Amino acid sequence: GMQHKYRETVLFFPTPGQTCHSYCTYCFRWAQFVGDQDLKFAARESDQLVRYLRRHREVSDVLITGGDPLVMKTRVLRRYVEPLLAPGLDAVTSIRLGTKAPAFWPHRFVTDDDADDLLRLFEEGLDAGKHLALMAHYSHPRELTTPAAEVALQRIQDAGATVRCQAPLIRHVNDDADAWADMWNTQIRLGAVPYLHVRGARHGTEALLRGAAGSRPATSRFRP
């Protein structure tokens, strides 16, 4: 249920968050969904994580991921986030949530019955001195332009969280410079941060040179 990925970064996979709003064919975490318990990362409680972090004070960054942790109700998510806010874990300065909820279900932050409690949890992280970020997956600019999506991003940021955006290159979806330039500029306009291209799955990938050729004109039109 836990992976010490880099010197400063630990990935944590809470069991209730090992599903998604939808399943992406390009996902490199396919092992979470195929029913093979020997391959799957999953942790029912956060006690093991807290003990590990107390022993490894070089870790400053915890990424809660899956699956998608925001399929969990806020009361369940709290069981995994609140222990990271407690005294004694001052070395942990960054808490990140890997999620596609802002694109697939922006109402999670707006009209869901526990949306306000979710935003209060973000505020509590800020009050505890943590940098809290949503690692949001957007694959096309249209995912950013619905009224619910725009309100969700505003509410997340008003609660003190940062939104960093990532996406893979997908054929017939965003494999041209216009899509990327539009997406990056829309993210900036809405206060989010274009962050990275996701890499990992080999099936269905675009040719590397094609992707690079498309990124250069998109970058030239990016207005940070």
Can you annotate each of these PLM segments?
Residues 11-16, 48-51:
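Short, charged beta->alpha transition segments
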Residues 29-39:
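Iron-sulfur (Fe-S) cluster-binding segments and ferredoxin-like electron-carrier domains
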Residues 1-12:
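N-terminal [4Fe-4S]-dependent radical SAM core
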Residues 47-54, 61, 70-222:
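Conserved AdoMet/S-adenosylmethionine-binding subsite of the radical SAM
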Residues 14-15, 19-31:
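Local cysteine-cluster metal-coordination motifs and their immediate loop/turn environment
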Residues 11-13, 63-66:
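Short glycine-rich or small-residue beta-strand-to-loop segments that form or flank ligand, phosphate
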Residues 40-44:
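Chitinase-like catalytic core of GlcNAc-active glycosidases
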